[in-house]
Amino acid sequence: MEKKWKYCAVYYIIQIHFVKGVWEKTVNTEENVYATLGSDVNLTCQTQTVGFFVQMQWSKVTNKIDLIAVYHPQYGFYCAYGRPCESLVTFTETPENGSKWTLHLRNMSCSVSGRYECMLVLYPEGIQTKIYNLLIQTHVTADEWNSNHTIEIEINQTLEIPCFQNSSSKISSEFTYAWSVENSSTDSWVLLSKGIKEDNGTQETLISQNHLISNSTLLKDRVKLGTDYRLHLSPVQIFDDGRKFSCHIRVGPNKILRSSTTVKVFAKPEIPVIVENNSTDVLVERRFTCLLKNVFPKANITWFIDGSFLHDEKEGIYITNEERKGKDGFLELKSVLTRVHSNKPAQSDNLTIWCMALSPVPGNKVWNISSEKITFLLGSEISSTDPPLSVTESTLDTQPSPASSVSPARYPATSSVTLVDVSALRPNTTPQPSNSSMTTRGFNYPWTSSGTDTKKSVSRIPSETYSSSPSGAGSTLHDNVFTSTARAFSEVPTTANGSTKTNHVHITGIVVNKPKDGMSWPVIVAALLFCCMILFGLGVRKWCQYQKEIMERPPPFKPPPPPIKYTCIQEPNESDLPYHEMETL
């Protein structure tokens, strides 16, 4: 009985100290919070205790105290009016025996404004209370700072987009940030990440990109939030071209920083492939095709004959351009050059033709890639191809244009692919229509004349547009639909004084000469095939006759079998023993 009274006395003493410690100290603080209509607000109160937590609650103070939510370490959460507590309040334990009690208010309206009280019951500190005056701003104009940027990057690389864009001096130690991406199909924005930067340096991510764009196949598993609130996109794809990412920073109730970044994607194309199409009569018409694959954005294909850029509209040469867009976003360009034979005398017996692709790359430059060269003789079927040109990257220096009385001669056989700075070049051709896209280029054309041995180096800066033209038919393909544009060009240009040009390109390959009797190669091939068929038929007939002779021959002679030898069995005599007696022996 005495032990029971001792335990009761100790229990009551502890309860008295507990109640005394709880009501010993009360801390009250008050803070004003400003919010705009339709925004989300998070009210947070945090503290650290020496002992343990007893209870935490949120209430709205009007004429009376309306309970919103209660948290007890043993019994858990309770929210009034049957509202779900998962989206309304959160309790987070912080290091060093601390805690954070947050109330989430979504889609702010005038009815939500008022006084909100956060009460923390601690032992042995006592009761701590913090009151928020939530005010709704309806006609307050925020001080916005907007900045727009463009980042150029090649495909399959990692894109890093800073949020502040050199404006860190305008940002305080505590702010709210959010990353979003523009949805071009619906003309809306999709939230990627949202968080809060506290005064003590901690960062809290409220919404991560995994929860909002998990169903998006274009940005899934490619967006991450790095240090200094930078957004990382890896790897970059063709479909990211033109995509706009925006970072919103709210420093205070009246100050918003907004930075938008537009992505521009580039892809280096493959080396263009030039082939000569089969024609029924090469003496009347010759056709060449230049194919460029895996290019983005759109590139330009230009043609050269004996080093002369085809830009003058004359009779004899026609060019048709086609564009195709694949499912992967890459473009495939095709240019067909048709040369019609002219009765005018030519300055040279052979011509060398090739194509060049001019594709834009980051840094306001152009990537020039030349195909192999095809050389053919005029008035015959002889044609050959040179090996592909070497590929180099360099800066192109421009020189004054030559006089109008001198036209450029053949391109050297050891030309190179050059990276041209578009910003340093100026076109010297006629202006293009307003709806055409212009690409300027610079080339060096060495030429020689029969009257002098001096070699001059001249720079031409031709400019060509393939998007639209008053004299040609436009061509664009989307979703595997082909359209084309056609342009007419001239024969090979010559010098004004009629000087003879020398071609230093060596002809290699297989040469097929035309027979003297005028018989074309299809007739020869048909005759050879006919002879082969006759020989094959004769062979089959001979084999059938041989098989028939074998079947009609008489069977071979077989000798008769040898005679059968018969033996005589003698009957037993009376003197012989019977069988059963012989058996007993």
UniProtKB/Swiss-Prot annotation:
Which source organism?
Homo sapiens
Q: List the disulfide bonds.
A: 45-118, 163-247, 290-355
Compositionally biased region (Polar residues): 385-418, 426-452, 460-475
GO CC annotations? cytoplasm; plasma membrane
What highest taxon heads this organism's lineage? Eukaryota
Q: Topology in the membrane? A: Single-pass type I membrane protein
Q: What is this protein called?
A: T-cell surface protein tactile
Disease tied to this entry: C syndrome: A syndrome characterized by trigonocephaly, severe intellectual disability, hypotonia, variable cardiac defects, redundant skin, and dysmorphic facial features, including upslanted palpebral fissures, epicanthal folds, depressed nasal bridge, and low-set, posteriorly rotated ears.
What is the name of the gene encoding this protein?
Answer: CD96
- Positions bearing carbohydrate: 42, 97, 107, 148, 156, 166, 200, 215, 277-278, 300, 350, 368, 435, 497
Q: Which residues lie on this side of the membrane: Cytoplasmic?
A: 541-585
Can you give the residue ranges of the Ig-like C2-type domain? 269-375
Residues forming coiled coils: none
Question: Main role?
Answer: May be involved in adhesive interactions of activated T and NK cells during the late phase of the immune response. Promotes NK cell-target adhesion by interacting with PVR present on target cells. May function at a time after T and NK cells have penetrated the endothelium using integrins and selectins, when they are actively engaging diseased cells and moving within areas of inflammation.
Complex formation: Homodimer; disulfide-linked. Interacts with PVR.
